[in-house]
């Protein structure tokens, strides 16, 4: 018996593309890194949709692959503004061609925080984007830097989240922590530590007290934060960081858990382990968890098999797969009309991949993608 898709709708939130204008700005090392998946990154049309259909994924929220334009020097702020506008307009056209299959996170010129805030507002109000994705720090400046308050306030007022995606740590940190093993340790360990630290900086700086309705998303099942939840909750309070009558010089008005549960959402991008999911659910609650793949660096079918294996009641699985994302991103919660005719087709291919890794199965899927 071929297993059917485990839920009625699936939305994936950390799904990358690559724009030619940004490719032209990338260094040779970045080009070598992305060359093996460049064709898939470039495709925001029918080829990508065929792969989504084959796995049973209804919608991708698209964002530019890291580091976007955040690798530019501080003196290139005007270039960053122009490139972001060009890329976001291009993405809006791709979404308009397939509005039931794609949504968009804006790429922002964080070299100039006020311009970043203005571009966020433009893309949300004029282009219908559902938030922004920022690749960690910008030349060593994190979002708790007071200069970024204008951007955070704008996101809060617009009611859209900011997705913080991993990037390499600042070079001095990487040199001390990871050399000479950077290529192995930075993507696997350095990125989660870097991104989890970014969120903790926001908490300790009082960002969520100043902006209580601001929402942040992080991927990879929480970037180590759920695992460290209790230690952070207890440790920062014991260290006197919590604002109390006896310690009134710190900015944090509540414990860490309060902010993680109120202001931070996490996705399953690239982490398809049920025990890790169970830890995140226990620490943050299911309402803070959303499905993602991390395409094209992770496999759509592996992500869907993980979704099938999650030990959730049917309604809870629907929340994780799409309902929480629909609410947070204010997406249309009706199943896409274009999906209805392909449901049985997509279920069949999902079942084929879930059931077998044979050469025949791979050949059939390859033929589907190329057709």
Label each PLM-derived region with a short phrase.
Residues 17, 65, 110, 166-174, ...:
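Short glycine-enriched loops at secondary-structure junctions
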Residues 45, 84-88, 116, 120, ...:
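Aromatic/hydrophobic pocket-lining residues that form the small-molecule binding cavity
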Residues 44, 77-78, 106-115, 119, ...:
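Alpha-helical scaffold segments that form or flank carboxylate-/histidine-based iron centers
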Residues 95, 124-284, 288, 344-345, ...:
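Catalytic pocket-lining loop regions of alpha/beta-barrel enzymes
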Residues 1-13, 17-59, 89-97, 118-122, ...:
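Mid-to-C-terminal alpha-helical segments outside catalytic/metal-binding sites
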Residues 75-86, 115, 142-150, 187, ...:
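Alpha-helix N-cap and loop-to-helix initiation/capping positions
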Residues 35-40, 47-74, 101-109, 130-134:
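Divalent metal-dependent hydrolysis catalytic cores, especially in the metallo-beta-lactamase
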Residues 28-33, 66-80, 114, 183-184:
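Surface-exposed, active-site-proximal loop segments in enzymatic domains
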């Amino acid at each position: 018996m071929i297993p059917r898709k485990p839920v009625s709708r699936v939305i994936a939130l950390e799904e990358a593309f690559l724009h030619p204008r940004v490719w032209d700005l990338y260094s040779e090392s970045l080009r070598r890194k992305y060359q093996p998946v460049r064709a898939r990154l470039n495709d925001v049309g029918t080829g990508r949709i065929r792969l989504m259909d084959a796995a049973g994924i209804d919608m991708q929220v698209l964002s530019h692959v890291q580091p976007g334009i955040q690798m530019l020097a501080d003196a290139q702020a005007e270039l960053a503004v122009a490139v972001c506008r060009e890329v976001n307009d291009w993405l809006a056209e791709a979404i308009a061609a397939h509005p039931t299959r794609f949504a968009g996170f804006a790429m922002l010129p964080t070299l100039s925080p006020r311009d970043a805030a203005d571009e966020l507002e433009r893309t949300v109000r004029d282009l219908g984007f559902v938030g922004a994705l920022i690749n960690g720090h910008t030349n060593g400046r994190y979002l708790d830097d007071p200069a970024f308050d204008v951007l955070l306030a704008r996101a809060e007022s617009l009611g859209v989240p900011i997705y913080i995606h991993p990037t390499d740590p600042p070079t001095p940190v990487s040199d001390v922590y990871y050399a000479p093993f950077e290529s192995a340790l930075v993507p696997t360990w350095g990125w989660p530590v870097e991104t989890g630290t970014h969120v903790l900086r926001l908490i300790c700086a009082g960002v969520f007290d100043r902006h209580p309705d601001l929402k942040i998303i992080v991927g990879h099942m929480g970037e180590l934060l759920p695992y460290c939840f209790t230690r952070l909750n207890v440790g920062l309070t014991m260290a006197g960081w919590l604002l109390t009558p006896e310690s009134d010089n710190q900015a944090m008005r509540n414990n860490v858990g309060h902010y993680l549960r109120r202001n931070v959402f996490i996705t399953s991008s690239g982490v398809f382990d049920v025990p890790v999911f169970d830890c995140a659910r226990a620490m943050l609650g299911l309402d803070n968890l959303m499905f993602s793949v991390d395409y094209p660096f992770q496999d759509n079918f592996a992500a869907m098999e993980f979704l099938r294996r999650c030990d959730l009641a049917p309604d809870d699985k629907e929340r994780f797969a799409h309902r929480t994302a629909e609410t947070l991103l204010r997406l249309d919660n009706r199943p896409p009309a274009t999906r209805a005719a392909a449901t049985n087709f997509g279920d069949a291919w999902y079942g084929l991949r879930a059931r077998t890794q044979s050469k025949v199965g791979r050949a059939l899927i390859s033929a589907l993608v190329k057709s």
